Amino acid sequence: MSSQYILDLLDAFDYADAEVHNILMAIDGEVVFEGHYAPYTALDPHIMFSGTKIFTNAAVGVAVTEGYLHLEDYVYDVLKDYVTQDVSELQSKVQLKHLLTMTSGVDRFMSGSELRPLTTSWIEHILTEPIVHEPGTYYLYSSGNTMLSSAMVTVATGKTCLELLNTTGFCEELGIKNFTWDMSPDGFNAGHGGIKITAEDLAKVGQLYMNGGVWNGKQILSKEWCDLAIGYEKTVENQGDYAYHWTAYEDGLYYTATGSYGQTLAICPKLNMVIAIQAGTKQNIGELLYQNIFKPYGDALDAGTVPEPDDALSAALAKRAENLNLMFTTDFTASPIGELVDDVTFTAAENQYGITTLSLDVHDDYIDYTMTDARGTHTIRNGIWQWLKGETSMTSNYTHHQYQYPTEPVYAYAEWKDANTLQLTWRFPELAFVDTLTLTFSDDGSQIGMVRSVNVNSGPLVCDEVVFTK
């Protein structure tokens, strides 16, 4: 494939202001392009949000193929130990196949951000959701469905989805290693979201499905399951474009399994192409792939006008890949206020975030930002004129789609925008999120107004200001 197609795609990302973190493209099972925008790397697992559902899909496929589950199994029967109220007639009709096709009959979207703050059983919570449509007749995407699928796998097999994939050869055969999966309070993998995985390993899963479940000559998932999941074979429930966590586009030219903020696994059987993308954007990555790769390359193949390889274009692409970078730097900045606020503990006015204190440790080449709230005390070291990598427990659920990990790696940068304004930028290399803190100081350094914002989020992108005084 001509490097021009990939260069056009990278240009399209820039033009659309689509922040891509990692991209890997393979044709006929061979990698033709791999790019990582600093600070994101090939080795860092990246959160997939609802892209996780394709792994739940694989676990269900294994459980069905090995006879632990059947597509016609009734959800409220398998999960009867988690039912806390009388089961309605419509609830009693919901089957596993309805969860997979998002036709369970629920009447509202349930996001993972609704579940993550819960410390009680997620499954009990989801099973109380009313079923208002005849199962199998009404499509409505809801993450609650896939969480129930995960629970059914565990109840039927005695293993979590991750344990099942690890013990049946799925992960071993594909060579998937740097792979984690969040758990619910009641002991199930978060089937709807919470996987962190590298772009390379994500692409392997796409290749597996496109190959009909075969990897290196070995049948890992059944071909029947892969065909049903992708949607090659239609059922009564999935007559539309959505099959089992795969969605068809352009009459089956390509299929995607996606997660929030640009996480995209795309397969194009016509081109025998797999593309894995991890990102932090609101842009439609699948549409950009169609406009710049799948359609023009497919049309050129049909017309017999595929460009010949060009050494100059290949060199240009290689150079472009080497210089992919999201870590801006500015000229050295400083402010006399830095001395006034250095090593001073400021007390927060009452606020919805539970923040109690803030302090800054100001140096010539870095600033330590320390904040205390109900979860404890959290520090991030921010480089001046340089990005610094660290590990932090900083509370972030309210800017991170209700994800809160004990600690996260972070790259941090500090810049004085003017004499009274300090801006801190935090990039979390395993997440989609980029947080910006704007600290505005009074002239005498006795008061700070702090506003935190984020690039993408299911909640507010800009938090309410928190005011601190000495």
Listing of model-derived features with the role each one plays in the protein:
Residues 312-470:
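Peripheral terminal and inter-domain segments
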Residues 10-40, 272:
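A short, well-structured edge-of-sheet supersecondary motif
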Residues 29, 47-72, 99, 148-153, ...:
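Active-site SXXK
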Residues 102, 148-152, 191-214, 263-280:
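Active-site-proximal alpha-helical segments within enzyme catalytic domains
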Residues 66-104, 124, 128, 157-193, ...:
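Active-site helix/loop module of the DD-peptidase/beta-lactamase fold
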Residues 223-277:
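Active-site Gly/Thr loop motif
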Residues 17-20, 44, 260-261:
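Short, small/polar residue-rich loop motifs at catalytic or cofactor-binding pockets
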Residues 260-329:
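Structured C-terminal helix/loop/strand segments within mature extracytoplasmic catalytic/sensor domains
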